[in-house]
């Protein structure tokens, strides 16, 4: 039997990190078993759905690298199938029409609460029986599933173990509303049955839905999939994760400069572990993932940990991989790569210092664009009269270079230090400010090599002019 998992988001908002982790676990489980991963859009709530949300979900899935084997399927296009199954249940007396109005049900619920009874639907309540008896053909009705009254629903949750719910706690679920719209718990069963889903991995907020759905599977004679319910994700303060804890949308993390491999690595560890290992390639995640190692306890989202992982992936990933995702940020900042070194060379040089792709884009700018002014603090400290001699000597030697290599540029700096009998900082820092515009960069000889001779010469002359003007105004 082919293992089949699914991710079934509702398009009423963005793809949030909780949903993304559920999708990732489902995707990894399928890949680990050599199975298939299905994407289904649960868009039966026609009033709240939006195409914008659908597009955001698909974009988020693709950005994270979770390509689906089937789909996306849309529930809104399957209403005929749902009605067909409703009719089947009606014909077998496993479902029935209920004519009790919302007002009547509210009245009964109020009475139950006043009598300190469990508020629930009871098909045998005298008022409901009377309402059904008085109904005429054509009156508005819902369709309810006839839930078993005896026994229990027992299932082995692959994360939480054995779960048992008494049928006496479950009422007769509405499976089709008065407007003809099918309900969530019903269409999920029909979809999973039709699509051959063998494994349902979802959030723990669905545990109460599972026994209801199992009873529908059994009424239809459909195979019941295995279930696994993941614990929720909390903020670092122990409260349920929300916008106040930072970004919650997958694409917001893209916008803030995170790599998908870093986010995937972080999300997989929010509840799953393999010994003490922290860093997992996609291949390792697929090979090692197991629901047996998923925790029953909630996990706390820690942005500092995510930033650490992102820095690791920026530093250690192939430059071509980083460049692919960096390009979006370069475009946002209107940094053109037309006039400068290969971006992969820049990434190799500057990535060590960058926690996000936004920082990487900012630190790439001076390789491609000239600046009109120096950073005020760096210039005040390093572009002073004492730097004039070292910069002039360095400029002369740089202009005379026949071969533009990092080694030759390093030799220039050493020669200036030797001839003027000064420490490395007396020329290194003024040079850094001169060629980058600021006070922080990787090794200045390597930076100059990538920037190119013409730009380096122009920028050193600009720094000398700045020093001259500063002295004139002193």
Curated annotation (Swiss-Prot):
EC class (word): ligase
Is Lipid metabolism given among the entry's keywords? no
Query: What EC numbers are recorded for this enzyme?
Result: 6.1.1.17
User: InterPro entries this protein is in?
Assistant: aa-tRNA-synth_I_cd-bd (IPR045462), aa-tRNA-synth_I_codon-bd_sub2 (IPR020751), aa-tRNA-synth_I_CS (IPR001412), aa_tRNA-synth_I_cd-bd_sf (IPR008925), Glu-tRNA-ligase_bac/mito (IPR004527), Glu/Gln-tRNA-synth (IPR000924), Glu/Gln-tRNA-synth_Ib_cat-dom (IPR020058), GluQ/Sye (IPR049940)
What GO molecular-function term can you cite, just one? ATP binding
Describe the reaction catalysed, as an equation: tRNA(Glu) + L-glutamate + ATP = L-glutamyl-tRNA(Glu) + AMP + diphosphate
What keywords were assigned to this record? Aminoacyl-tRNA synthetase, ATP-binding, Cytoplasm, Ligase, Nucleotide-binding, Protein biosynthesis
Q: Where in the cell is it found?
A: Cytoplasm
Q: Could you tell me which Gene3D superfamilies the record lists for this protein?
A: 1.10.10.350, HUPs
CC annotations in GO: cytosol
One GO term under biological process is: glutamyl-tRNA aminoacylation
Major localization listed first in the record, in broad terms? cytoplasm
Q: What does the subunit section of this Swiss-Prot or TrEMBL entry state?
A: Monomer.
| Protein name according to UniProt | Glutamate--tRNA ligase
